[in-house]
UniProtKB/Swiss-Prot annotation:
Part of the 50S ribosomal subunit; part of the 5S rRNA/L5/L18/L25 subcomplex. Contacts the 5S and 23S rRNAs. Pfam families: Ribosomal_L18p. This is Large ribosomal subunit protein uL18. Belongs to the universal ribosomal protein uL18 family.
Length: 122
């Protein structure tokens, strides 16, 4: 039986989530990538609470996506900078990166690098 790409992603995500856990001191930066959008959340897994979030659907960021679109590396970088700025404003300096079963490449990589450049440590 052939393993589909979706099944492989889900297996990878389960394997990653067994090891990656967000605490109040070092929450988890979870990234979800769809075909058209990208979402990033900083999550405290102990309290099961989302502390900050950003996505290509945010009203504050919509102007930035008029020319570049929402499914590009540039859009992912904008989201990464935004989530990092919001996390730093909330007093969160260090996070654990959860790539959500996706490969560390393309939009996921662009988001992570932009968040690091904006001052988030992981």
């Amino acid at each position: 039986m052939k393993i589909t790409r979706k099944a492989a992603t889900q297996r990878r995500h389960r394997r990653i989530r067994r090891k990656v856990f967000g605490t109040p001191e070092r929450p988890r930066l979870a990234v979800f990538r769809s075909h058209r959008h990208i979402y990033a959340q900083v999550i405290d897994d102990v309290a099961q609470h989302t502390l900050v979030s950003a996505s290509t659907l945010d009203r504050e960021l919509r102007e930035a996506f008029k020319d570049i679109g929402t499914a590009t590396r540039e859009a992912a970088a904008v989201v990464g900078r935004s989530v990092a700025q919001r996390a730093l404003q909330a007093g969160i300096c260090q996070v654990v990166f959860d790539r959500g079963g996706k490969l560390y490449h393309g939009r996921v990589q662009a988001l992570a690098e932009a968040a690091r450049e904006a001052g988030l440590q992981f």
